[in-house]
Amino acid sequence: MTKVQISGYGDNLTINGTRLGDLSPADHEAIEKAKGGQNYAPLENVVVSSVQDLSTLICRKPDPEGVKAYIEEELLDGLCCYSAVNQGQLNETIVQAVIKHLTEERIPTVPRSIRHKYMSAFLLAATAITGMDKVVPKVAGVEAAELLAKLSRRWGYRVKGIPSNEALLVVAANNFHGRSLFAVSASTDKESREDFGPFLPGIEVVPFNDADALEELFKAKGDRIAGFIVEPIQGEAGVIVPSEDYHPRVAELCKQYNVLYCVDEVQTGFGRTGVDFAHQLYGVKPDLMGCGKAAGAGIMPVSFAAGRAEVINTLTPGSEGSTFGGFPLAAVTAVYAIKVLVEENLAQNAREKGARLLDHFESIRQDFPDRIKEGRGKGLLTAFQMFDEPHLDGHKVSLGLLKEGIYAKETHRHTVRVAPALTITNEGIDHIAEALRKVIASL
């Protein structure tokens, strides 16, 4: 029988004689290559160790003198776990709520087959913040997106009257809805799809920000289309902001052709774009919305689908479920994530600090018009795009920012996404801009 000996905490956490505090960045990389799947390409020569404050991580880098296993430096978190930590790293209000419920309230772990009192708190808070009739809790963001697809199909059969097994879903090209089989079936990204087929049928693709193409598809196949699933702003594609009239027209077309308008707010929600949810930027209200990431404030994985009662009510006992979806600790975490979003005015701060950051991007673009094509975004979901030249490499920029104490990450070759905590200060924004200017000047 294989034995595993585990002891200690933090740096003293020891697995079969290997103590974390003794490992260099190269040691961590070697362990990951030997023992883990290679489905990520982490930034080289850096290992995050702990949190200093809401926007700052403590990381370990190789000792330039080669004496110690590592040196420690501060790192401003400009990625926020892909917008999962909008409330800031280890937000004290949420952490204390979790600790109190674990240690004083003796919060249980039970499934949905028996009611627990914290579900009521979650449902009341989630419907209030989203403005939706009903909510179904899940765990991962991709589960929320997938539930949008399942709900659309079921509504299509049971309410719209689409013949059995003929329902179609529509998605936008260059989308990102996660990594499940549904999500990659809906994806147009070659790397996400390669050698994972055969894919799920019944999915149609139209260009993003092209309502005319959507209308043509609705005219041709609208009687069998159950739902259109779309990101308000495409995040993983490079922070692609649609025209102001796109979502209003999409909502109108969906209503005209009796198609569910479903928005994936997993990355754009919870204040990230300067409003509570990005669809609000365009004055529309979806039939369904999927939320995740910051719904758990980076402390617990929490997601959910919210929507009109007519749609959610198509679910019946046994038709949908999740062991940890809405379990008590997740419910409490989500409630306090919402509390912080509202009481700390995170959307407003994102709006103000995002405008400041975009002003910096424009100033840098003007100083380097041969290198920076544009800066774009809404709130603190931002990106800057360089021209398509070999020396203007996004990964090189990410590594340069790392040397300047900023953690940001390229998305596609020439675009770098910057999405810090919504609690960031003006000084933090200026620090990002100063570092970026220095790195761009060095290219």
Residue map of PLM features:
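Conserved N-terminal phosphate-binding loop of PLP-dependent enzymes in the Aspartate aminotransferase
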Residues: T2-L443
